[in-house]
Structures are given as C-alpha cells and as structure tokens.
C-alpha cells in the first residue's frame, strides 16, 4: 500500500473486503455503497454486514456504538506520521517497504467495527444514520415505515443483549 497520513487514516475498501471475508466467508462477495466514507457493506458467502473504520464515526457515535458492539483491533504499521501497512487477515503481513531514515516502523492497534447483517446492523443505522444505498432507497420511499422498522429491530437487539447479560450472571 502507499503510505497514508496517520492523522486521517481510514482502511481501504480492499482491506475491508478481506476483513469481511475472513469473518463471513470467502467467495461470491459483493458490496453496496454506503452513505459515509470509511464505512463498507459486504455480502459474503456465509453472511455479511458493515465493516466500519472507527475513524469514520464521531466520538459521540463511538460512545453509543460501544455500549453494544466492541471494536475489533486490527494492526497497522506506522512509520513517523504515516501508515505504511496493514496486517491482512488472510496473508498476514508481507512485502511492506519502509525507509530506514524515517525511523523504525511500529505496529499500532487501529479499531474497526463489524456489524453483522442479521442483528448488529441496526445499532449502526440507529446510532449514526449510516445507510447502504438499498436501505437509503427504502427510507426515501417510506420514511415512517423505515424508521419504525429500524427502531423495532434496534429495541429487539438491545433486549436480547440484556437477556444474555442476565443469563451470564452466576446463580
């Protein structure tokens, strides 16, 4: 990859796709546009969902999202103020070039969120207003029905999370 400024680094589409395929199955993967840069949607062979660079969310959105979904720590290779590599979930890391005169490169953790299509997607859409082009079309066609369905799915997700937390309490 070309060096990218660390200050405004967002994972590229190709890496987001690899991350999605490592989680939801490789082969036959398709993607849909979303309403925000740094947010990707993939449908993979086994499942699918949103892959979201934490840098694409505001601090307030991250706080709300993290009440329900935990970020996945990926590793980026940083040299000076530039990202020069990303640890790939399939190939791991290889072929990264760096310039010794810029100082030693170091691995840093970079948070990425995965919102599975069957459940967690409602968290992202409810908290942020981010949509796929398909969902945006549904919302534009009938905003009231779309919002009502989204709210219902979000509440179901929160209720299920609470039940799991209660079930995990030792008796």
Q: Predicted segments — roles?
A:
Residues 116-170:
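Short, compact, well-ordered microdomains
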Residues 3-55:
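Short N-terminal "domain-start" leader segments
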Residues 107-116:
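A short, exposed loop/beta-hairpin motif centered on an aromatic-Gly-Thr core
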Residues 47, 112, 121:
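Extracellular structured ligand-interaction cores
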Residues 2-14, 19, 23, 139, ...:
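Intrinsically disordered, low-complexity regions enriched in Pro/Ser/Thr
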Residues 3-6, 61-62, 143:
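Short amphipathic alpha-helical segments that mediate assembly, nucleic-acid/protein binding
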Residues 25, 36, 85, 100-102, ...:
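Eukaryotic, polar/proline-rich low-complexity intrinsically disordered regions
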Residues 44-105:
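A short, structured beta-strand/loop element
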């Amino acid at each position: 990859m070309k060096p990218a400024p660390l200050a405004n680094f967002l994972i590229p589409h190709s890496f987001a796709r690899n991350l999605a395929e490592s989680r939801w199955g490789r082969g036959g993967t398709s993607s849909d546009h979303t309403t925000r840069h740094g947010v990707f949607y993939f449908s993979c062979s086994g499942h699918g969902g949103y892959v979201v660079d934490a840098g694409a969310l505001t601090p307030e959105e991250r706080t709300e999202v993290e009440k329900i979904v935990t970020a996945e720590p990926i590793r980026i290779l940083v040299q000076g103020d530039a990202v020069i590599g990303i640890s790939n979930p399939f190939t791991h890391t290889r072929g990264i070039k760096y310039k010794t005169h810029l100082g030693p490169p170091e691995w840093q953790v970079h948070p990425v969120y995965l919102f599975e299509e069957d459940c967690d997607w409602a968290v992202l859409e409810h908290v942020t207003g981010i949509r796929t082009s398909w969902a945006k079309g549904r919302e534009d066609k009938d905003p009231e029905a779309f919002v009502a369905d989204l709210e219902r799915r979000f509440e179901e997700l929160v209720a299920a999370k609470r039940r799991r937390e209660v079930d995990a309490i030792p008796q």
